Structures are given as structure tokens and as C-alpha cells.
């Protein structure tokens, strides 16, 4: 399978299908540090990133925000002292789409730059 971090998001329409269990088994190994959670009956990808201080956490938050704006796909972001929690899901379909796995992989790449 193509590296998720090099892929582009596609426009997600309300009638788009959520990823299947088979697709999750195929995609999740590329973003192994992301947990699949369920909140308000909606499956999401979530990861907590650790940093040495608030300034580093805020810098990562801003980079994640810029990435989201560029892709037109936006996560929930919680910035705290020394950590940032990023949660991806597709609002229009109330669940996980391939775009969420792509954006999780791209978010991971921010740590490498």
C-alpha cells in the first residue's frame, strides 16, 4: 500500500462510506501510535504527543493547524503544558474515512521536521 503520508485527502461527502473493518486493519499499521476511540458513538483516531514545555506544544499545535488548513480537513486539538492531543474523524460521515488515516500519518511527519 502507498505511504499514507504522501497521499492527498479527497473531498468527503455526507454519503461517503466510512472505512470498513478490513480497511482499518490495512490502514492502522501505518499509524500504529494512533488509538481508535469511540466518542458520542463516533469512531475517531487519537494520539497524545509529548513535549518538553508549553512553547513546544504550541508550536506543534500551530503546525498541525496549518497542515489541516492546507488539506481542508480539521481535527480536534487540545494543547496543554507538555502535550497535544490530536483527534481526527470525518464530521460529515460521523466516523472514520481514509482521509483521517492520511492526516494522522501527515501529523506524525510533523515530528520529523
Curated annotation (Swiss-Prot):
Give the keywords, sorted. Lyase
Q: Which GO terms describe its molecular function?
A: 4-alpha-hydroxytetrahydrobiopterin dehydratase activity
- One annotated GO biological process: tetrahydrobiopterin biosynthetic process
Name the Pfam families on file: Pterin_4a
Q: Which Gene3D superfamilies does this entry report, sorted A to Z? A: Transcriptional coactivator/pterin dehydratase (3.30.1360.20)
In short, the EC number is: 4.2.1.96
Q: Which reaction does it catalyse?
A: (4aS,6R)-4a-hydroxy-L-erythro-5,6,7,8-tetrahydrobiopterin = (6R)-L-erythro-6,7-dihydrobiopterin + H2O
Q: Which NCBIfam families match?
A: PRK00823.1-1
What family does the Swiss-Prot or TrEMBL record give for this protein? Belongs to the pterin-4-alpha-carbinolamine dehydratase family.
Designated name of the protein: Putative pterin-4-alpha-carbinolamine dehydratase
* Gene source species: Nitrosococcus oceani (strain ATCC 19707 / BCRC 17464 / JCM 30415 / NCIMB 11848 / C-107)
Amino acid at each position: 500500500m502507498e505511504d499514507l503520508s504522501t497521499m492527498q485527502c479527497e473531498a468527503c461527502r455526507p454519503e461517503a462510506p466510512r472505512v470498513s473493518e478490513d480497511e482499518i486493519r490495512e490502514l492502522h499499521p501505518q499509524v500504529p501510535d494512533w488509538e481508535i476511540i469511540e466518542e458520542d458513538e463516533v469512531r475517531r483516531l487519537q494520539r497524545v504527543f509529548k513535549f518538553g514545555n508549553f512553547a513546544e506544544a504550541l508550536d506543534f499545535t500551530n503546525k498541525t493547524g496549518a497542515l489541516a488548513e492546507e488539506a481542508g480537513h480539521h481535527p480536534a486539538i487540545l494543547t496543554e503544558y507538555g502535550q497535544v492531543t490530536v483527534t481526527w474523524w470525518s464530521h460529515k460521515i460521523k466516523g472514520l474515512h481514509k482521509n483521517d488515516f492520511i492526516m494522522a500519518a501527515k501529523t506524525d511527519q510533523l515530528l520529523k521536521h
